[in-house]
Amino acid sequence: MLNLFILLLERVGLIILIAYILMNINHFKTMMNEREKRRSQWQLIIIFGCFSMISNFTGIQIRGDEIINGTVYNHLDPDASLANTRVLTIGVSGLIGGPFVALAVAVISGMYRVYIGGADAYIYLISSIFIALISGYFGYKAMRANRYPTIVKGACIGGTTEIIQMLCILLFSDNTEHAWTLVKLIAIPMISINSIGTAIFLSIILSTIKQEEETRAIQTHDVLQLANQTLPYFRSGLNEQSAKKAAEIILNLMRVSAVAITNRKDILTHVGVASDHHVAQKAIITNLSKRAIQSGTLKEAYSSEEIGCNHPGCPLEAAIVVPLRVKNDVVGTLKLYFTNKYDVNYSDKQLATGLAEIFSSQLELGQAETQSALIRDAEIKSLQAQVNPHFFFNAINTISALIRIDSEKARELLLQLSQFFRSNLQGARNNTISLEKELQQVESYLSLEQARYPDRFNVSFDIDRTCYGALVPPFAIQILVENAIKHAFKNRKYNNEIIVKAHKAQTGLVISVSDNGHGIPYEKLDKIGKTSVHSESGTGSALENLNRRLDGLFGYEASLQIHSDHQGTQVSCTIPYHNLEEEKIESNHCR
């Protein structure tokens, strides 16, 4: 029995080794994180199907009470049986991929086991189906909860599934005496091995996923910390002063030897190692930077020759160069240098890419703000381009708080914040955008607000789908929703409802935002949207600004209409109906 246990342990070791190798492949990690998708499940079927085949033909032959340790079995004599790790592969496939994956793997494994033959081979197809159903059930419950079974639960399920196989051998065997002899010999080793193997397999998966989450949390925290400190400088444009301050902050917070920032031609700043010949206000001297600017893609170098610095004895051995963009045009580069090429890792590349995207957004936003002051409708565009700094820092603080608790949620909110600012930037360049884009902006805003105040309010949408292409002023609906969230409910924490509606009428596109809040006092109702109204929760300047934009774009008829009583408030406006496709056709005719 001990000999069989050791031999089975060797077979489990092979499966675990392959699993460990797979969990260090990025594609497999991605597949495990998306295991509920049908494409990933088909891939899991292929992988665990191969595992089950390996388990079958590397089994240990049992003949009576004799253990025969061969190498590979493609066929068994009628009186022989096979001790293997087949149950382990079926069980783990179910715990990871659910019943669909488990049943498919069970059929593959069971049919191949029947093909190999031996005593009562059909039993193992039957037991495989039972095992797949049980493990698949627990795997399905875990997937619904967006998690994996714990190691202890996995070990218990692994042992239970092997017990089920032993019961199937005893119940369905044609030769009860032979079945009892076989079970007495293999039961304890196989139940123990299956339990241990399942636990180890799950521990590899769980530890790898946990390590990935911790790495993402650290990266997100680093990006936020760097972004929070460097954001003010790039709004003023890409110049020597802003570049130097930002580079000094990056050098202090990252494990790099030097940081440089350039425009398309010159070095704006270089701080750290090799600053004696990488001098600001001089032309770019490295070929690597020139290639990054020309191609518009990230470039890496792991030797002085690849960097392309012509200065003799330059101590820089490795570099990451990321382009900075404004309106899809490369305007400069962010460069991270290392004196030891082995210091460069994947996290550094991800961090550099993230910083470059944030810096590019700030440069683009700053440029848009500058340009908006030079064009004819500067007043309207300046109102559109305003970004509430309190909202930004509240969002940053919310994301920072979530990093250690739920890194995946923090990553999603960071993407929503990026989408929010990108929409702000697009709105700063246009008097109107499509209703669909405006609703996307509202959803990004709501994601961030609901993260700050979970379950505080519920927003529902009643939108005529044929109106998605209608043109509306940027941030019009967002301002109305934001106004309702901030002012309608006061300190009420429950049953707060907001309804956003949009439909086409004879008079134009009708947009309304209503709430079930406390209502607006009668004495203030006539002033809202026309002038600043001072109160404990604000001044009403957002509605005033929106009203001014509506008047400027569409005339007095488009002004906000406000109806309020003790049961709630409705703010609406009716604007001329213009479709995005119609605007494109008219634009092409004008050309």
From Swiss-Prot:
Its EC number is 2.7.13.3. One of its GO terms (biological process) is cell wall organization. Disulfide bonds: none annotated. The chain crosses the membrane at residues 2-22, 42-62, 88-108, 114-134, 151-171, 185-205. It catalyses: ATP + protein L-histidine = ADP + protein N-phospho-L-histidine. InterPro entries: Bact_2-comp_sensor_kinase, GAF, GAF-like_dom_sf, HATPase_C_sf, Sig_transdc_His_kin_internal, Sig_transdc_His_kinase_LytS_TM. This is Sensor protein LytS. It comes from Staphylococcus saprophyticus subsp. saprophyticus (strain ATCC 15305 / DSM 20229 / NCIMB 8711 / NCTC 7292 / S-41). The lineage of its organism: Bacteria, Bacillati, Bacillota, Bacilli, Bacillales. The gene is lytS.
